[in-house]
C-alpha cells in the first residue's frame, strides 16, 4: 500500500510495550499489525504475533467495509461483467495439513491466511510472481498479474499495482487493475512499421492503453458514492527477446538487474511519481529523500479521482543474462538502489535460481527486514 498526496496517510499502529492487544474503543487490536483480535487469542490470526491473555470480553468483527477481502471475491472488469476467481488448494502454513472450506486447518485448527493475503503465480518456468500482505498490515492492497510464452526468453508481461492505503476497496481495485493491464498486454503484440523505433513507439502506446484499461477496472471496482475512491499505482514491463518495454504511474518500479559477472550495470528503468522523486530531482540525496516526510506520497495514480494517469514509458535493449524485476515499495523500501537489489538477488538465487522460489525469497527477505508494507514482486529471467 502507498500514500496519496491529496489524502492523509493512515496512522500506523504502535505496539504495546507488554505485547498485549491494544483497545480502541470497544475493540481489541493486535499490537503488531493492528488487525482485530478476540479476547483469549494466543496469537494474531493476521500476522501470527503472540498475544498475552486478555480479560476483556470478545469484540465484534470488522465491519464488511473494513474486513480483509478474499481473492475469491468476484471482481468487476471494465466491461461490467463479473470475473470469478477460483480458490487455490493450499497446505496449512503451520503444520502442512489440509485447509478446509471454512478456512481452518483440519489438523491443527489454525486459521489459514486468505488467498488475497499471500499468493504466487507462475505461467511459465522462467517467469514468476509473489504477493504478500507483509507483517504490519492486516490487508494486502498490492497486486501482481503476469503472463508469459512458454519458451524461455521469448515474451513475458509483468504488472504490479499498489493500492493507496487511505482509499476504500483498493485491495479489490488494484487486483482488478493489474489483471486488466496484464490481459491487454498479453493480447497486444504490436509490430510497428518494421523498424526498432516504430516498435518502441507502438509499445509505448500499448503501455498507455494498458494503464487506461487498468484505470477503467479500478473505477469499475469503486463504489459510486465512495468519498475515498479506490486508487493504486501501476508499473508494467514487457520482455520480448532482448528488448524491455515499460511504463509506470506512481512509485512501483521496474528494474533491469544483470548477473553480477556482467559488464552491464544494473539500472532502475522507471521514474517514480512521488514526493521523494521530486526532491531527488531537486538535488536531495536519494537516502534522505526516500526517508523524509511524505516520501511515499505519490503524485500520480490510477482511480476515479486521478487527474493524470498517463504513464511514463521507455524501452531498453539488454545484453546477456539477468533479471527483469517489477515490484512495489514493500520490497524496494529495503533496497532502493539497483546495485543493492542486484546483489540481493544474486545472494538469494545462489540457494535456488528458479524464478518462483526467488520471488518467494524476496518477499520473505522483505518481511525479515520489518515487513512494514505489502509486498509485490514479479520476475522474468533473461
Regions found by a protein language model. Give the residues of each.
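PP2C/PPM-type serine/threonine phosphatase catalytic domain
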Residues: 1-382
Amino acid at each position: 500500500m502507498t500514500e496519496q498526496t491529496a489524502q492523509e496517510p493512515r496512522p500506523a499502529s504502535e505496539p504495546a510495550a507488554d505485547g498485549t492487544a491494544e483497545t480502541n474503543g470497544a475493540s481489541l487490536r493486535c499490537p503488531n499489525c493492528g488487525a482485530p483480535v478476540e479476547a483469549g487469542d494466543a496469537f494474531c490470526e493476521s500476522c501470527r504475533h503472540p498475544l498475552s491473555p486478555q480479560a476483556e470480553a470478545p469484540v465484534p468483527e470488522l465491519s464488511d467495509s473494513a474486513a480483509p477481502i478474499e481473492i475469491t471475491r468476484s471482481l468487476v472488469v471494465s466491461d461490467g461483467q463479473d470475473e470469478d476467481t477460483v480458490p487455490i488448494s493450499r497446505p496449512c502454513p503451520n503444520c502442512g495439513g489440509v485447509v478446509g472450506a471454512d478456512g481452518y486447518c483440519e489438523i491443527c485448527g489454525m486459521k489459514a491466511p486468505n488467498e488475497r493475503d499471500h499468493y504466487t503465480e507462475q505461467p511459465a518456468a522462467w517467469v514468476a510472481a509473489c504477493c504478500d500482505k507483509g507483517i504490519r498490515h492486516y490487508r494486502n492492497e498490492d497486486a501482481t498479474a503476469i503472463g508469459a510464452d512458454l519458451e524461455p526468453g521469448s515474451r513475458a508481461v509483468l504488472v504490479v499495482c499498489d493500492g493507496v492505503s487511505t482509499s476504500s476497496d483498493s485491495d479489490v481495485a488494484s487486483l482488478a487493475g493489474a489483471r486488466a493491464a496484464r490481459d491487454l498486454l498479453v493480447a497486444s503484440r504490436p509490430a510497428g512499421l518494421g523498424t526498432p523505433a516504430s516498435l518502441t513507439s507502438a509499445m509505448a502506446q500499448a503501455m498507455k492503453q494498458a494503464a487506461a484499461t487498468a484505470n477503467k477496472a479500478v473505477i469499475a471496482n469503486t463504489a459510486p458514492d465512495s468519498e475515498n475512491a479506490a486508487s493504486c499505482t501501476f508499473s508494467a514491463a514487457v520482455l520480448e527477446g532482448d528488448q524491455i518495454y515499460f511504463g509506470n504511474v506512481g512509485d512501483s518500479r521496474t528494474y533491469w538487474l544483470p548477473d553480477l559477472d556482467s559488464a552491464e550495470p544494473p539500472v532502475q528503468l522507471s521514474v517514480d511519481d512521488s514526493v521523494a522523486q521530486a526532491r531527488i530531482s531537486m538535488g536531495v540525496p536519494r537516502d534522505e529523500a526516500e526517508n523524509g516526510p511524505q516520501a511515499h506520497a505519490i503524485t500520480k495514480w490510477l482511480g476515479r479521482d486521478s487527474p493524470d494517469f498517463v504513464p511514463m514509458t521507455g524501452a531498453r535493449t539488454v545484453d546477456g543474462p539477468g533479471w527483469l524485476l517489477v515490484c512495489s515499495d514493500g520490497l524496494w523500501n529495503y533496497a532502493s538502489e539497483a546495485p543493492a537489489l542486484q546483489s540481493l538477488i544474486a545472494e538469494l538465487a545462489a540457494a535456488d535460481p528458479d524464478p518462483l522460489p526467488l520471488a518467494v525469497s524476496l518477499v520473505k527477505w522483505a518481511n525479515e527486514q520489518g515487513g512494514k508494507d505489502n509486498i509485490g514482486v514479479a520476475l522474468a529471467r533473461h
